[in-house]
């Protein structure tokens, strides 16, 4: 969900702006030179990939990975999130630009900044990405063709996810993290959607009914939409956090099972379990998810 927030932020503050693009770190110098001085046409997300399009038909493609993040700043016309991405634990701080100090020019970049984008009214710095590259239109199509459908995109076809699950003997908890099967579902959404739909994460994908697969798709879409709107991953229903509004749920009342191992389930009282599967920690309730 955070990549869709970044795409929205990029579109809001940079679309139609002629920008300077540089690489203070030096690792993206050649790519930055291809984009420097051009106008940003827009930005969109597909799963965990960000695509920023320019008027010369080239596209900046970024994947934050685990440690990457974008930082934004500017004058009173340049509003939005100050930092989006890792570190995940502190969430995102969002406030009107200029709240901290008047904008005159971007601050001196840190030596770790892979890519800096500067317009007349503000700037964006990228640090620690897994991917930062420039693509042609054909290369963009190739990258996107390898990605599964993104529930947040209006043109997403869930059938690709359904087919991937139906023919697989892998646990559904692993399939949900496979970006070639479904894009944008991270570790928290994986655990929480399976809990909410009362599905054992260790069940083979091919054992799930059409109804169960559809419910998983729709619930992940629902939770991702909330994530984009609120800026944090809130998966609990109001009745399971009485008196705690959605905007105040994070972190203590935000999730059912994620990071709650060893604690009693909110709904049935069974102890929440955690197990490492495919290199990531998977949380679930053995009582609710059978």
Q: Residue spans of the language-model regions?
A:
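Structured catalytic/nucleic-acid-binding cores of DNA maintenance enzymes
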Residues: 1-290
